[in-house]
Amino acid sequence: MKAFEFLYEDFQRGLTVVLDKGLPPKFVEDYLKVCGDYIDFVKFGWGTSAVIDRDVVKEKINYYKDWGIKVYPGGTLFEYAYSKGKFDEFLNECEKLGFEAVEISDGSSDISLEERKNAIKRAKDNGFMVLTEVGKKMPDKDKQLTIDDRIKLINFDLDAGADYVIIEGRESGKGIGLFDKEGKVKENELDVLAKNVDINKVIFEAPQKSQQVAFILKFGSSVNLANIAFDEVISLETLRRGLRGDTFGKV
């Protein structure tokens, strides 16, 4: 039973995707006692899984699984394995480690649409939930993508079988994706995107509190948000529930 549970009202909470950059297993075990109910996915950032003892990776995944949380390795690790011609080995290792989902992306590399489609299919055929990511890691490359380009790729991935599509925002949330160089949401582009994709299938990377507030006020508490720092999960949950000044009386 939660403290002050008499204040709770039923509401539809969107997905919360947390970024794990190498948290210790025992920390994860204790940490989940505080916020495990509010996490849906955990991404082991970029290629961090490849530099940690595999038994530790498995231990952490099991702690997350105990809370019904799906874990997946960062898209950069997929891109690295794919560029080495080791996609099958990558999927096999993901299965052995206990990952239930994978991320297909081209943020640091170039993958054709056909290759992207086939990678999604192969991952799905191997029993994984598939999240894809739209956007480039380097701002100078990402800014070459128009909002129409992003919309087309989101719909392409969903048609190819992806379960969710993540909009690139990186850890900074500045000068990339739907954010300007100050980190403010590009409202005009967001409006166009919202009219042309299934928002319920889109996950917005929103590392900054101001961005989380903007998306919640725009779409409501059911908006899907990613790149949430492990120590910001409770903060985000209060924003979703109107238990913090930024959203009080507005959700």
UniProtKB/Swiss-Prot annotation:
Explain the activity's dependence on pH.
Optimum pH is 8.5.
Q: Which cofactor does it need?
A: Mg(2+)
InterPro entries hit by this protein: Aldolase_TIM, Arch_ComA, ComA_synth, ComA_synth_sf
EC assignment: the record states: 4.4.1.19
Instruction: State any single GO MF term.
Output: sulfopyruvate decarboxylase activity
Q: Tell me the superkingdom of the source.
A: Archaea
* EC top class, as a word: lyase
- One of the protein's GO biological processes: coenzyme M biosynthetic process
Name the SUPFAM superfamilies on file.
(2r)-phospho-3-sulfolactate synthase ComA (SSF102110)
Claim: Lyase is one of the keywords in the record: yes
Q: In which pathway does it act?
A: Cofactor biosynthesis; coenzyme M biosynthesis; sulfoacetaldehyde from phosphoenolpyruvate and sulfite: step 1/4
Alphabetically list the UniProt keywords: Coenzyme M biosynthesis, Lyase
One of the Pfam families matching this protein, by short name: ComA
Which reaction(s) does its UniProt entry say it catalyses?
(2R)-O-phospho-3-sulfolactate = phosphoenolpyruvate + sulfite + H(+)
Role, per record: Catalyzes the addition of sulfite to phosphoenolpyruvate (PEP) to yield (2R)-phospho-3-sulfolactate (PSL).
Query: Subunit info?
Result: Homotrimer.
Q: What else is known?
A: The enzyme is stereospecific.
Report the family membership: Belongs to the phosphosulfolactate synthase family.
Protein name from the UniProt record: Phosphosulfolactate synthase
What's the source species' lineage? Archaea, Methanobacteriati, Methanobacteriota, Methanomada group, Methanococci
